[in-house]
Design a protein with these regions (language model features):
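Active-site gating loops and adjacent loop-to-helix segments of metal-dependent hydrolytic enzymes
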Residues: 74-104, 162-190, 255-276, 298-301, ...
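Glycine-enriched alpha-helix->loop->beta-strand junction motifs that scaffold or abut catalytic
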Residues: 240-246, 274-277, 294-303, 324-329
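Metal-coordinating catalytic core of metallo-dependent amide/deamination hydrolases
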Residues: 137-284
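His/Asp/Glu-enriched, well-ordered alpha-helical/loop segment
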Residues: 271-278, 320-406, 414, 423
């Protein structure tokens, strides 16, 4: 007897043939998918403890976001109309620095709830909050929340072992002058010792990687090419190889970092021994064709944060060119205060339209490719293609049910396109992760025991953080038709 059988749905398998099974069914036993096929056959061959009727539903693999920052969700709404470093120095760093361990745990709960409600079951959390260092209470508080919620979290522990340039330090002070009321935490020459940083990452991998029934992972994450030494980069990649994990870093997000270097970030990472099939580069907005060829030749993966990059005015990553060179590109949802949501449907639609307009080519990217970038390509980007990203026997049971009986989805001429162009995320009504139902009827049952009212708790925590950080004037701003 199986644990769960899902029947009567349209199964969007994302397998090698990209098979769509009308009136399809999925059999789940434990944390694994054991069979996928037509409902008639599955009904004849299997009994189950629980049966889910997916009539008028699309059944998808759980979405994977390959680049996120979690704690900033409590700063939602404060990032509007600010370029990257204005936002980073005058909003994010002050805000996250004002958070204590409980605030971070609340943020993790809110993030997990919103992620699951829109079908996002796996996310790579870039842990790049201000101050650096290892805070055990912060980390364990977050991990406890992720475990309770039932999400699949990849904690990419960040470090910087190289001081920023004096030019950048001075520029940061100039940028901070815009907001004199803010309690700034500006960059300085304080850096981690390379070996100590690598030792910390290794100890975290040994302690936490594979916990929470395999849903918790830990990666090494050198913060940014400009503030990590070649030794730090090479050491991170070696750790990834040693522990059979991936490693990730922010790369070529804005023009400043590229213009201030003799080498491009991609060239520097290549020369330092960081590129390869275990490397996932976040952003890659300011990259050349030569950089893209290097990414392709080394099988280096890219996380595309389309909404966040545009919200910050950072630019548009040349994704169609990357795809044409066979670079694995996956979707990322990045910082919540940039896009103000945790919603892969929103990011997919934006990406699908953005590259058409930017390239003046309606065929620059397809809805199908964007759907791949949120599922099977994303699984490949995080080194989990063998276990995630598609609905196939032998893979982990991360499954999303999308209600198609909606006005906005009527008519739906072609389902893959409708899922990208006509779906907003509110149509998700059931989510399984690791074979367990983690979202149903508008609730994340695993979080019920942690917070009586998560929304009220998060709103109160956000207000307190904003006050402590001196961000009140940004919260209480007036109507703005033309930004200063």
């Amino acid at each position: 007897m199986a644990d769960v059988v899902i029947t009567n749905g349209t199964v969007v398998t994302m397998n090698d043939d990209r098979e769509l099974i009308e009136d399809g069914a999925i059999v789940v036993d434990g944390d694994e998918i054991v069979d996928v096929g037509p409902t008639d056959r599955i009904d004849e061959e299997y009994t189950a403890t629980d049966r889910i009727d997916a009539s008028d539903h699309a059944v998808l693999p759980g979405f994977i976001s390959t680049h996120v920052h979690v704690s900033g969700i409590l700063l939602r709404g404060l990032g509007n109309y600010r370029n990257l470093y204005d936002w980073l120095l005058n909003v994010k760093r002050p805000g996250t620095s004002a958070m204590d361990a409980e605030d971070h745990a609340i943020a993790a709960a809110l993030y997990s709830a919103e992620a699951l409600s829109t079908g996002l079951t796996t996310f790579v959390e870039n842990a790049t909050g201000s101050g650096g260092g290892y805070d055990a209470s912060l980390l364990e508080g977050k991990f406890d929340v992720y475990d309770a919620a039932g999400v699949r979290n990849i904690y990419a522990y960040a470090f910087a072992d190289k001081a920023p340039s004096q030019e950048f330090v001075e520029s940061a002070s100039d940028i901070a002058m815009r907001e004199p009321e803010v309690n700034h935490v500006l960059p300085d020459e304080t850096v981690a010792d390379t070996q100590e940083a690598l030792d910390t990452v290794e100890s975290l991998i040994e302690q936490y990687h594979g916990t929470a029934d395999g849903r918790q992972s830990v990666w090494p994450a050198p913060y940014l090419a400009t503030i990590v030494t070649p030794e730090g980069l090479a050491g991170a990649y070696e750790l990834a190889e040693k522990y059979d994990v991936m490693t990730t870093t922010h790369t070529a997000e804005d023009a400043y970092n590229e213009q201030s270097r003799r080498l491009s970030s991609v060239e520097y990472l290549r020369n330092a021994g960081y590129l390869g099939d275990r490397a996932l580069l976040g952003h890659c907005v300011q990259v050349s064709d030569a950089d893209i060829r290097t990414l392709a030749a080394t099988d280096t993966k890219v996380a595309h944060n389309t909404l966040a990059n545009c919200a910050l005015g950072a630019g548009i990553a040349p994704v169609p060119t990357m795809v044409n060179y066979d670079v694995t590109v996956a979707m990322g949802t990045d910082n919540v205060p940039n896009s103000d949501s945790v919603n892969m449907f929103k990011d997919m639609e934006f990406a699908a339209h953005l590259h058409k307009g930017h390239n003046r080519d309606a065929g620059a990217i397809t809805a199908e490719k964007v759907l791949e970038m949120a599922t099977i390509d994303a699984a490949r980007a995080i080194g989990r293609e063998d276990s995630l990203g598609s609905l196939e026997a032998g893979k982990l049971a991360d499954i999303v049910l999308v209600d198609l009986d909606r006005i906005s989805l009527t008519p739906r001429t072609y389902l893959p396109a409708a899922l990208v162009y006509q779906t907003t995320g509110c149509e998700v009504d059931t989510v399984l992760c690791n074979g367990e139902i983690v979202y149903e009827d508008g609730r994340v049952p695993g979080l019920d025991g942690l917070y009586d009212d998560l929304q009220s708790t998060a709103a109160e925590a956000s207000a307190n953080v904003i006050d402590r950080a001196g961000l009140g004037s940004q919260r209480d701003r007036t109507w703005t038709s033309i930004n200063e």
